[in-house]
């Protein structure tokens, strides 16, 4: 399996599979949440933004908050600043908080933000070197509150993700899916403890592929998925193979490339083959990517896809914020299909 797919929970694209999820913005058990970059005309008045949603989750927590994130970065006076205040308030009233961060995300994080998180009462902070588990990273962005509500999306625990990056996420109250997100957190939490104790990482019990009925979660890498959680590397191509009329995809970048040793980019065609096969049988493919998807390594693959019949590709550039240049921001970061 390519390293690029060894990511803990693959992001919103392919994460939640529901036979009911079509054009509606809300279905029972799920609320679509949208980060609208400030100083743009991309507003969606019928969707809430993640700052208020996360604050509401933390304010409503009674017993526990579990957070799995790639990295953490705050900024004074930002929406994230206020969100962390709500997390601090939860810890002060006795809510048990577990925060799990990817080891490779430490260098991307703000040191002051990590110090602030570690200082929260009743918060246990752990760092997981996921490369020692599967060779990849935790790229997940999720939280679970009281084992009854969850949030999963493209938003990093980063102030820019709440104000200056185009993002999507789901607030989840569906009991089955919440329990599956919780199970993934527990698996990774135990993995961190095992590595800290120089013990083998326990593998989840082997299980057959879950039935594709109702609402269900998929994640990767498959070998570390708890029972009942499907394999995103199988599900995404399968969804594309079942498409009859149209597929719309929005994401940061698109290229049939993985991440190998010594900064190599091995060819990885699983998803790309499925996209091309769908276009070949007449399915309309509409792909929207960010302007970060134009480097000399990735652009040729994008061009080779764009020349195919039934394929439309748009490269999107977001305007600079009125306050000036903000590094690692002003970009499409959604992962939706």
Feature roles, as predicted:
Residues 23-337:
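Charged, low-complexity intrinsically disordered terminal segments
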């Amino acid at each position: 399996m390519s390293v690029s797919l060894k990511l803990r929970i693959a992001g919103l694209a392919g994460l939640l599979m529901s036979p009911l999820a079509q054009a509606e913005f809300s279905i029972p058990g799920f609320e679509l949440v949208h980060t609208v970059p400030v100083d743009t005309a991309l507003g969606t008045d019928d969707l809430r933004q993640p700052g208020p949603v996360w604050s509401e989750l933390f304010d409503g927590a009674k017993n526990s908050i579990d957070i799995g994130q790639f990295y953490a970065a705050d900024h004074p006076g930002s929406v994230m600043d206020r969100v962390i205040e709500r997390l601090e308030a939860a810890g002060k009233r006795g809510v048990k908080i577990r925060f799990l961060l990817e080891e490779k995300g430490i260098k991307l994080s703000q040191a002051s933000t990590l110090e602030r998180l570690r200082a929260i009462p009743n918060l246990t902070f752990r760092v997981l070197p996921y490369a020692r588990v599967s060779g990849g990273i935790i790229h997940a962005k999720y939280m679970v509150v009281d084992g009854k509500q969850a949030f999963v999306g493209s938003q990093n625990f980063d102030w820019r993700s709440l104000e200056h990056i185009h993002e999507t996420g789901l607030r989840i109250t569906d009991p089955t899916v919440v329990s599956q997100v919780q199970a993934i957190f527990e698996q990774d939490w135990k993995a961190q403890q095992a590595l800290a104790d120089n013990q083998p990482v326990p593998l989840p019990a082997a299980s057959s592929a879950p039935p594709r009925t109702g609402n269900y979660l998929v994640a990767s890498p498959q070998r570390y998925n708890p029972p009942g959680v499907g394999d995103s590397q199988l599900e995404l191509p399968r969804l594309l193979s079942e498409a009859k009329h149209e597929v719309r995809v929005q994401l940061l970048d698109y290229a049939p490339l993985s991440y190998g040793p010594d900064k190599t980019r091995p060819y990885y065609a699983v998803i790309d083959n499925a996209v091309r096969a769908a276009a070949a049988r007449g399915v309309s493919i509409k792909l929207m990517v960010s302007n970060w998807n134009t480097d000399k390594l990735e652009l040729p693959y994008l061009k080779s896809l764009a020349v195919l019949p039934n394929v439309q590709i748009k490269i999107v550039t977001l305007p600079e914020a009125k306050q000036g240049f903000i590094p690692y921001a002003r970009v499409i970061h959604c992962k939706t299909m």
